[in-house]
Amino acid sequence: MTDVAEEAGWATAKTLAEALPYIQIYDRETVVIKYGGHAMGQEDVAKVFAADAVLLKLLGVHPVVVHGGGPQISRMLDKAGVKSTFVDGLRVTDEATMEVAEMVLSGAINKEIANWITLAGAEADVRGVGLSGKDARLITAEKVTRTKKDPDSNIEQAVDLGFVGEPTKVDPQLIEALLTSEHDYIPVVAPIGVSPDGDTFNINADTVAGALAGALKAKRMLMLTDIKGVLDGNGELIREMTIEQARALIDTGVATGGMIPKLENAIHAIESGVEAVVILDGRRPHAMLVELFSEYGAGTLIKR
């Protein structure tokens, strides 16, 4: 063994020893992971994510994955010649778009992520289980209503978003059964919901993750994004904040674009019983492990 290899071994042992207190903190605790962004479409990054999820399970954590798929849906709609329009960041979803969205989310992305997890955990028999909110009525949803101000009359007008929904009820029994099974299952949930009448709805994945984390009373919700976390007015990373400070970022306009719904869903999750939410860069290898098992973590921690 070379000196370099020996030093690397000692460094690995030191890292594992330093992680012990954090491993004990998360033992048998549920962590909901919102997996999305452009990193989800990169096979090498997806394999690292799957391996990290398996490692969490083997360390005693109960990971639950909720995934998005906006870019993949857009590509499929383009191929089908279906034009997309958006209101407040939500895709207007007619019947044809809903059919494509469900096919991509539940039929392609969901099963691919579950398969990567199963492959990564094959030696230890850790398995990914692909689900959508329609399974066992995991997510009951209703139609989203939005208004938009007419630029000419300055009057708020209702906007029909089609089959875009928001959760009204989350029944976590199926997820809890998988997590407490004698087998090592990792649930992977597509953000599709169903109304009491059986209508299918496309739901924002951040919203689903927050609602599910609240229903499961998760220890943490990790929101993997394409940026390093929440930034202040100077573009610097905010390491930690309260939900009051998160609201202030929204109210003062410091938080913009896609960060607004992320903060809103983080606030809602914490108010529903989640201990803390972390917004972090999912493109960085092993970001989840750094956040959960190191002193300084990664990204922005939001707590009550």
Curated annotation (Swiss-Prot):
The record marks 34, 262 as: Transition state stabilizer. It comes from the Bacteria. SUPFAM superfamilies: Carbamate kinase-like (SSF53633). CDD domains: AAK_NAGK-C. Pathway: Amino-acid biosynthesis; L-arginine biosynthesis; N(2)-acetyl-L-ornithine from L-glutamate: step 2/4. Substrate binds at residues 69-70, 91, 202. One of its GO terms (cellular component) is cytoplasm. It catalyses: N-acetyl-L-glutamate + ATP = N-acetyl-L-glutamyl 5-phosphate + ADP. Its EC number is 2.7.2.8. InterPro entries: AceGlu_kinase-like_sf (IPR036393), AcgluKinase_fam (IPR004662), ArgB (IPR037528), Asp/Glu/Uridylate_kinase (IPR001048), Glu/AcGlu_kinase (IPR001057), NAGK-C (IPR041727). Transmembrane segments: none annotated. It is an enzyme of class 2 (transferase). GO terms for molecular function: acetylglutamate kinase activity; ATP binding. Keywords: Amino-acid biosynthesis, Arginine biosynthesis, ATP-binding, Cytoplasm, Kinase, Nucleotide-binding, Transferase. GO terms for biological process: arginine biosynthetic process via ornithine; L-arginine biosynthetic process. It is found in: Cytoplasm. Belongs to the acetylglutamate kinase family. ArgB subfamily. Catalyzes the ATP-dependent phosphorylation of N-acetyl-L-glutamate. This is Acetylglutamate kinase. The gene is argB.
